[in-house]
């Protein structure tokens, strides 16, 4: 079922991009991360590939995430709020010479693995204390976020 929802999300994004591209031909997707939920190397990993990445930071990879970028409107949307969100948002801003808002127009959470929603906590009062960042999720995850801390605090404070 999880894979079906992920595929449906990707199809919806693809369809939306096609519609959006009809109006804004320059919109594109930028990869912000490609690794599984824990990033690469994984915490506690002592295998050869992990050891190389610990020794050579250029081999490290952020958790899987995408940015949908509209260069005409200077807006962007984030797909998945990962544990690497601080670095991903900073790097995005640097790559684009701060021409875009630091925060995205909205955040789409594709599914409920920890690598896809735990970065939302960085929007809370202890870090950025954002105001009304739009987050798009499926109903079951919406209920989870509204009913469980620390996520419910984000909802309550309208971060």
Annotate the PLM regions.
Residues 1-24:
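Bacterial Sec-dependent N-terminal signal peptides
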Residues 23-159:
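Binuclear metal-dependent hydrolase catalytic cores
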């Amino acid at each position: 079922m999880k894979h079906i929802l992920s595929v449906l999300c990707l199809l919806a994004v693809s369809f939306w991009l096609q519609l959006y591209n009809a109006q804004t031909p320059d919109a594109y997707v930028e990869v912000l991360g490609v690794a599984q939920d824990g990033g690469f190397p994984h915490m506690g990993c002592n295998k050869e590939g992990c050891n190389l990445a610990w020794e050579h930071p250029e081999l490290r990879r952020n958790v899987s995430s995408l940015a949908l970028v509209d260069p005409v409107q200077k807006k962007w949307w984030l797909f998945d709020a990962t544990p690497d969100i601080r670095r991903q948002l900073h790097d995005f801003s640097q790559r684009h010479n701060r021409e875009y808002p630091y925060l995205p127009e909205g955040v789409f959470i594709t599914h409920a693995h920890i690598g896809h929603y735990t970065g939302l906590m960085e929007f809370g009062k202890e870090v950025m204390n954002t105001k009304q960042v739009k987050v798009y999720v499926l109903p079951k995850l919406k209920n989870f976020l509204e009913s469980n801390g620390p996520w419910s605090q984000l909802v309550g404070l309208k971060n």
